[in-house]
């Protein structure tokens, strides 16, 4: 194993409370029916517009409006320290980095907010490459984010591990031909990880140190 690609939301950072709160505020601001927190949580990992269009029967223009409104609300509410890391994230990334693994992130989040989170959490020095939803033609679960990362490093799928908490992460990894690791402490469950046939399933990110 040479390269480990991480999802961000629900895998490295516990962003679920802020994301679902922002989604529910977006519904109210736009004047749409408010979905439940659990309904919102189930969509985490998809691009914003697709998220809103899956939650409600809205047209493309309203989907764009929801995505724009979400980003505006998120920018206000996302103060430094508003989002924390899951246990053992920092020390695990540090250990992997020291062992010589290349660490990358593939996220449905935009680059500006991701980099702000990484700086706030002091993780930027461990990450060699970032691919966001804006860098590819097709988002998760298509393989584009992983394919772009493999091309950047000139590394084969056989030497790569995709780590994420959502079925979209595992499906993306499978579609790109890399090994996959599902985490159970984020927004997905062990049952979901088993159902989408993750190669490995862990309850703590530190367990990766025993896999690679």
Regions found by a protein language model. Name each.
Residues 28-33, 59-60, 98-99, 122-126, ...:
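Short helix-capping segments at alpha-helix termini
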Residues 18, 47-50, 61, 84, ...:
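Short alpha-helical
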Residues 45-77, 87-97:
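A metal-dependent, Asp-based hydrolase signature
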Residues 1-2, 38, 94, 110-111, ...:
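Asp-based, Mg2+/Mn2+-dependent phosphohydrolase catalytic module
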Residues 76-105, 111-115, 143:
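Short, acidic loop-to-helix structural element flanking the phosphoryl-transfer center
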Residues 1-42, 56:
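Active-site neighborhood of HAD-like aspartate-dependent phosphohydrolases
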């Amino acid at each position: 194993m040479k390269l480990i690609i991480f999802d961000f939301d629900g895998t490295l950072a516990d962003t679920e409370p802020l994301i679902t709160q922002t989604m529910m505020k977006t519904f109210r601001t736009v004047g749409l029916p408010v979905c439940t927190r659990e309904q919102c949580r189930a969509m985490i990992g998809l691009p914003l517009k697709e998220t809103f269009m899956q939650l409600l029967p809205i047209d493309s223009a309203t989907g764009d409006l929801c995505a724009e409104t979400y980003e505006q609300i998120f920018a206000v509410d996302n103060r430094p320290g508003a989002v924390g890391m899951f246990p053992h994230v920092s020390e695990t990334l540090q250990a992997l980095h020291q062992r010589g693994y290349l660490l990358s992130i593939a996220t449905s989040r935009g680059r500006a907010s991701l980099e702000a989170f990484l700086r706030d959490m002091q993780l930027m020095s461990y990450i060699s490459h970032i691919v966001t939803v804006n860098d590819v033609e097709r988002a998760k679960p298509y393989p584009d984010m992983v394919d772009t990362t493999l091309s950047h490093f000139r590394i084969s799928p056989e030497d790569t591990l995709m780590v994420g908490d959502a079925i979209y992460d595992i499906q993306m990894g499978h579609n790109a031909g890399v090994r996959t690791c599902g985490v159970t402490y984020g927004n997905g469950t062990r049952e979901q990880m088993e159902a989408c046939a993750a190669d490995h399933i862990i309850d703590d990110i530190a367990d990766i140190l025993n896999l690679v």
